[in-house]
Amino acid sequence: MTLKTLAGAALAAGSGAVLYLKLLRQPILTWGATVEEAEARLPGDELLEDADGVATRAITIDAPAAAVWPWVAQMGPYPRGGAYTYDWIENLLGLNMHSADIVLPEYQQPQVGEGFGYGANKMSFKIVEPKHVLATQSANGNWVWSFILDEQDGTTRLISRNRFRLPRLRDRIGMIPMEPGSLLMERKMLYGIKQRAGKLASQRETARA
């Protein structure tokens, strides 16, 4: 490969990075969220004040929070309920995810301090407010993942916020190409919760009829 070719490749890569950072990154990190949601201080933010990266994604679910919460509460690797996304991708990464289509009664009462493995990370519940907030944090403190359920008129706004501390420059650079992949997985997860919550709400309505 000639010096000219290398220079051209470097220029193309640099131009692509600039394009991504200026035009694509923010929509990827805030998919589904309103400007207000993306900029708001949310429960769980206080667990990691000096985050180097934040992703806020959201979806509206046509079901009350009581039908959404069970799916959030039981999330996690087997024997918990999985993450409702592409299990085969997560399992290639060694996460042992098996997305449940039923409510698992034994995982409906997460407790503050309770932990579970998540690949190389050990996560623990830091904030548990049933039908409203569930926040977890990694053992090293560098990752906080919070779910906020905001019910209005029988529908629920489900907000997922990830906050990261990336101590090393290589970590910060390495995170950039991972961001589109995280959107792919999280979008599937949010739709997975929406589908399950809607079905559960319908089942409960039928049972009451």
Report each predicted region and the residues it spans.
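A short, structured loop/turn motif at beta-sheet edges
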Residues: 62-66, 127-131, 148-157, 197-202
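Amphipathic, low-complexity, repeat-rich surface-exposed segments
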Residues: 2, 13, 168-171
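N-terminal alpha-helical membrane-insertion module
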Residues: 1-7
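Short, hydrophobic/aromatic-rich segments at coil-to-beta transitions
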Residues: 109-113, 128-136
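Short, surface-exposed coil-to-beta transition loops
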Residues: 54-56, 120-121, 142-146
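Flexible, solvent-exposed loop/hinge segments and secondary-structure transition points
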Residues: 100, 117-119
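Hydrophobic ligand-binding cavity/cleft-lining segments
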Residues: 7, 11-14, 19-112, 203-209
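Beta-strand/loop substructures that line and gate deep hydrophobic ligand-binding cavities in soluble
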Residues: 31, 37-38, 137-195
